[in-house]
């Protein structure tokens, strides 16, 4: 019986997040947020171009602040789906939902209050803040490339073209970083 009570206690935050997400979606529907954003984006071509990148950054911020990717999914995915009613902008809806999912996972990954980050540092028996600061450096490089990729996706509206160009950009960035590090190591050896 004790395990039942303990298990229920562990589920309370997840249930609360879902209830708040449903409430937020209900308020958004009542206020017509989806229609407002659709009209704003529909009349402004530049807004639709940057929408996936903006949603990616919002998801990173929200997941970093709350320490949960699933809560961010529950809050932002219904909002993004409501922005694209019908079949007329299906490609942009898919790209924007992907941006939310990726941003939420990135924000959760670098958040010092995320359960996965806490468990990773505890499992590795390392200082928690050192663990957060070391993984943030790598994640921010990839996040910057993702922002460029989502801008490309907003322009071309073809997911595989954006993915391919993002991979090429990431390869170029990593190559430049590697060469810079090799040059720095060579200078230190000669000094």
Model-derived regions: residue spans:
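Core transmembrane alpha-helical segments of multi-pass membrane transporters/permeases
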Residues: 1-35, 49-61, 65
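Short amphipathic alpha-helical coupling elements at transmembrane boundaries
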Residues: 2-10, 35-43, 118-122, 129-133
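Hydrophobic alpha-helical transmembrane segments of multi-pass integral membrane proteins
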Residues: 18-21, 45-93, 100-108
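Transmembrane helix-loop junctions in multi-pass membrane proteins
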Residues: 25-37, 65-67, 146-160
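Membrane-interface alpha-helices at helix entry/exit sites of multi-pass transporters
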Residues: 89-91, 124-139
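Membrane-embedded alpha-helical segments of transport systems
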Residues: 102-111, 135-149
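Small-residue-rich transmembrane alpha-helices that serve as helix-helix interface/gating elements
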Residues: 161-173
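Membrane-interface capping segments at transmembrane-helix boundaries
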Residues: 175-188
């Amino acid at each position: 019986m004790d395990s039942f009570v303990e298990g229920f206690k562990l589920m309370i935050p997840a249930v609360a997040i879902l209830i708040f997400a449903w409430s937020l979606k209900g308020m958004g529907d009542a206020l017509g947020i989806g229609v407002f954003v659709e009209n704003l984006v529909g009349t402004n071509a530049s807004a639709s171009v940057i929408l996936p990148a903006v949603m990616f950054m919002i998801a990173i911020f929200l997941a970093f602040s709350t320490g949960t990717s699933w809560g961010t999914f529950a809050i932002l995915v219904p909002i993004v789906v409501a922005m694209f009613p019908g079949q007329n902008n299906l490609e942009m809806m898919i790209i924007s939902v992907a941006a939310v999912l990726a941003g939420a996972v990135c924000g959760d990954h670098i958040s010092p209050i995320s359960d996965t980050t806490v468990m990773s540092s505890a499992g590795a028996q390392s200082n928690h803040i050192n663990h957060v600061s070391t993984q943030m450096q790598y994640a921010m490089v990839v996040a910057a490339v993702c922002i460029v990729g989502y801008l490309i996706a907003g322009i071309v509206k073809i997911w595989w073209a954006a993915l391919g160009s993002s991979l090429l950009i990431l390869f170029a960035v990593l190559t430049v970083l590697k060469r810079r590090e090799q040059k720095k190591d060579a200078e230190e050896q000669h000094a």
